[in-house]
Amino acid sequence: YEIPDPNTDIELAIQANSSWFSAGQEVVINWGDGSANETVSDTGGSTYIGHTYEDAGVYTIKISGSMKRYGRSGNVNIAGQVLLTRVDSFGKLGITSFEYAFYNCAGLMSVPKTLPDSVTNMLGMFNICNGAAFNPDVSKWDVSKVTNMNRLFRYCSGAAFNPDVSNWDVSNVTNMVYMFGNCSGAAFNPDMKSWTLKTGVNTTNMFAGSKTQPTEWLDELLVAWAANPLQGSNITIDFSPNKFTEVEGAPLPAVADALAILEGKGWTIT
């Protein structure tokens, strides 16, 4: 955290109740300013754990122990969220949910290069992380157990934003609603050709409001997905605002073949 002024308050996305802690779990927070460590567990609390920094400066917060969740109850703001500049490690806390963990953290610049393999919920994890230079290195993240990516990157609209998700295993994800919604930055050009979608995954508004890609982008994506024998079935997906290449009102032959294969699996593509 980069604290600009004396007596600045910040809050962590942690509450002292059973939504964050299972029985027997607790964490110890080192605030990085020489103050006493704070122990947090399920004590029935209903507010976010906060701290006041008496002096301006850069502080590293360390959290040890165990908890099942780091995140917020919906898309709510917490004190000092824009002052968070980097997350160096997710540790070994046993976290399963990062729901809205970094919501509206406009100053966030970097995240760990590995994700805990216990994580299943990434709902809104980086929603409105819209700093101009924000482009997290998530290329090696193991997301194979994740089921919820709803709004994961929504409104990540910074000019540099274009995370490498090319090797992500999203085969267990059931919710991709607004996943890339409003990712309107100049660099945005996601490579998803290796993805295997789960049968029936909800992709409503997956790209709504995002930067329009060249028609070749959708051509290549459809051909790659159709060639994947493990690709799921019964999927309704709206690629809007993106379109595939058309010549005299018809898709290219390879794209037409891909559409036929996917539609044969029960896909509805718009």
For the regions a language model picked out, list residue spans one by one.
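Negatively charged
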Residues: 1-270
